[in-house]
Design a protein with these regions (language model features):
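The canonical Cys-X-X-Cys-His
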Residues: 107-111, 223-224
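Short pre-active-site segment immediately N-terminal to redox-active cysteine/selenocysteine motifs
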Residues: 103-106, 219
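Structural alpha/beta surface segment adjacent to cysteine/selenocysteine redox centers
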Residues: 100, 111-183, 188, 193, ...
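A short beta-strand-turn-helix
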Residues: 79-97, 121
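Bacterial N-terminal signal peptides that target proteins for export
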Residues: 2-14
Length: 256
């Protein structure tokens, strides 16, 4: 932003704020807009650190606004996030805390998080986990997601075994690799090939895409826990703590 524009905006803000004070109205009436701008300019030049303070405050307010907008979106879409039949439910379907994970089969951090999710399932009997296919990294990711959804349609009980085989594998995930993983766990490959192109698969991908946009999810993995979004992978201990906090007070950070 050009300096002149910056100063003019600051001047406008200062002038607007000053008008709120009745005692200052008489003094302002005797000063021109140019005089006020000059005073502000001189003050800023003598105290340049105020610009950094203003920028930090602006960023803070923007972050707070973004977090509020995201929280509102989570609340508005809570049923789709946690109860949609198009999500894959792991763990306790009636658990007292639900962790939703958006993932991509070609996401390296998702691969690392696989063991953490497995540990959570093993160690927390009151946890419900919902997996959301969110293929954003490549066309191969979309192909793999289509196969995965077809696996869920054919045999939900086999999904977790398939998921671990595909996400835990090396190399790029795509349709062929995903089909091989499905065959390995004993599923009907011809039926999967047919179901991959079904309206249900398209609707599932569309649902995840719309949720991702509503929550402003820009990468994977991303977790929804309580009414908050956790962008990026967290190690097991931090995920466990976050779940405990939500269980305790409904938020990621409970007041002391």
């Amino acid at each position: 932003m050009p300096a002149a524009t910056f100063f003019r905006r600051l001047s406008a803000i200062a002038l607007g704020s000053a008008m709120l004070f009745a005692g200052a109205q008489a003094a302002l009436a005797q000063q021109s807009k140019e005089d006020i701008e000059k005073i502000i300019r001189e003050y800023i030049l003598k105290n340049p650190e105020i610009i950094e303070q203003a920028i930090l405050e602006l960023r803070k307010r923007q972050e707070e606004a973004e977090n509020k907008s995201r929280t509102d979106a989570i609340v508005q879409n809570k049923k789709l996030l946690t109860e949609s039949p198009r999500g894959v439910v792991l763990g306790n379907p009636k658990g007292n805390v639900t962790l939703v994970e958006f993932f991509d089969y070609n996401c390296g951090y998702c691969k690392r998080a696989l063991n953490d999710v497995s540990e959570l399932l093993k160690n927390d009997p009151e946890l419900k986990i919902v997996l959301k296919e969110f293929p954003i990294l490549s066309p191969g990711s979309v192909e793999a997601a289509r196969v995965a959804i077809a696996v869920r349609m054919q045999n939900p009980a086999k999904y977790w075994e398939f998921h671990r085989a595909l996400l835990g594998g090396r190399g790029e995930a795509n349709g062929a690799v995903a089909l091989a993983a499905a065959q390995k766990v004993g599923l009907d490959i011809e039926r999967i090939k047919k179901d991959m192109m079904s309206p249900e698969v398209a609707a599932t991908l569309k649902e995840s895409e719309q949720l991702g946009k509503a929550l402003a999810i820009g990468g994977t993995p991303s977790y929804v826990l309580g009414d908050e979004l956790i962008p990026g992978a967290l190690p097991y201990d931090r995920l466990k703590l976050a779940i405990a906090q939500v269980r305790k007070c409904g938020k990621l950070d409970c007041p002391n």
